[in-house]
């Protein structure tokens, strides 16, 4: 039941991401970095549920485009701290707004009560709770 919805969501988001030349993982990284202060690659990977080696290519690409920056960690010479740049925040905001407009169109098919219930249950599921 969830798989068809997920496929439709991904199909709806892919053109938005492509229009802004960002991958799904790149967008996830920008979202995570915008929600918190600088973090290490390992902490970021844990926060988004990815292996730290899996996101290296995405981090390299985001850095090359000036969307994130990597700085040496003053407390650990082996680690680099990651932060979103103003340009990265601009891209993240544009993608997020377009995706949210698409979600609003989908949710517009639901009554107010259905929408409230759907969002509550979805929030519970994504938080790992039992509805």
Model-derived features: where do they sit?
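Conserved residues at beta->alpha junctions
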Residues: 3-4, 86
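Charged, amphipathic alpha-helical coiled-coil/dimerization segments
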Residues: 10, 38, 42, 60-123, ...
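Conserved alpha-helix in the HATPase_c
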Residues: 57
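N-terminal helix-turn-helix DNA-binding core of bacterial DNA-binding proteins
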Residues: 7-54, 65
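Hydrophobic structural patches
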Residues: 2, 30-33, 122
């Amino acid at each position: 039941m969830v798989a068809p919805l997920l496929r439709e969501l991904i199909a709806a988001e892919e053109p938005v991401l492509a229009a802004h030349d960002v991958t799904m993982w790149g967008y996830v990284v920008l979202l995570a970095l915008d929600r918190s202060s600088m973090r290490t690659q390992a902490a970021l990977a844990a926060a988004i549920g990815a292996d730290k080696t899996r996101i290296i290519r995405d981090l390299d690409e985001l850095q090359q485009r000036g969307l994130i920056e990597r700085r040496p960690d003053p407390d650990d010479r082996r680690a680099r701290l990651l932060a979103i740049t103003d340009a990265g925040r601009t891209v993240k905001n544009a993608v997020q707004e377009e995706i949210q407009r698409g979600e609003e169109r989908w949710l517009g098919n639901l009554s107010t009560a259905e929408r409230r219930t759907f969002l509550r249950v979805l929030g519970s599921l994504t938080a790992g709770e039992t509805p």
